[in-house]
From Swiss-Prot:
Record text about domains: The common region of SV40 ST, 17kT and LT proteins comprises the J domain. This domain is essential for multiple viral activities, including virion assembly, viral DNA replication, transformation and transcriptional activation. This domain is also required for cyclin A-transactivating activity of ST.
Gene Ontology biological process terms from the UniProt entry: symbiont-mediated suppression of host gene expression
Predominant cellular place of this UniProt entry's protein: host cell
Subunit architecture: Interacts with host PPP2R1A; the interaction inhibits PP2A activity.
Protein name: Small t antigen
GO MF annotation: an example: zinc ion binding
Length: 174
């Protein structure tokens, strides 16, 4: 996410969207703000045409960059037990984090919650990449905490769960 737009462009986009700069990387929130501002800035609705053009350019560039980051990578392979285990339905709460705080502190190869699966995927992808994984390129809980500078607490987990819940399964790269 940090390579999608340069610093000046990202600040300008967040200002145009009317969002706090700390929300950079929260794609669902940015999308809602973009759609709202499109109505406000649209020239046919009496809005500012220049702001509309600039916002469209920056948002499109950000969106294209995120799509590029979401291209499938063909890193490590999954064995049959992992594929079968991930298809089980453990329930809504256990789906995100089966055991707090154990899953948040240490990866468990036997756990099938999203927190552990995304951390395992992070570790596998890290082996095949030169540059570090960052939020939106990787949706694991650790990348989320590092990107937004958040502590390891249940409140942070709830924020992460909310964003993961609004993210398509394909984008999670599981």
């Amino acid at each position: 996410m940090d390579k999608v737009l340069n610093r000046e462009e990202s600040l300008q986009l967040m200002d145009l969207l009317g969002l706090e700069r700390s929300a950079w990387g929260n794609i669902p929130l940015m999308r809602k703000a973009y759609l709202k501002k499109c109505k406000e800035f649209h020239p046919d609705k009496g809005g500012d045409e220049e702001k509309m053009k600039k916002m469209n350019t920056l948002y499109k560039k950000m969106e294209d960059g995120v799509k590029y980051a979401h291209q499938p990578d063909f890193g490590g392979f999954w064995d049959a037990t992992e594929v079968f285990a991930s298809s089980l339905n453990p329930g809504v709460d256990a789906m995100y984090c089966k055991q707090w705080p154990e899953c948040a502190k240490k990866m468990s190869a036997n756990c099938i919650c999203l927190l552990c699966l995304l951390r395992m995927k992070h570790e596998n992808r890290k082996l095949y990449r030169k540059d570090p994984l960052v939020w939106v390129d990787c949706y694991c809980f650790d990348c989320f905490r590092m990107w937004f500078g958040l502590d390891l607490c249940e409140g942070t987990l709830l924020l992460w769960c909310d964003i993961i819940g609004q993210t398509t399964y394909r984008d999670l790269k599981l």
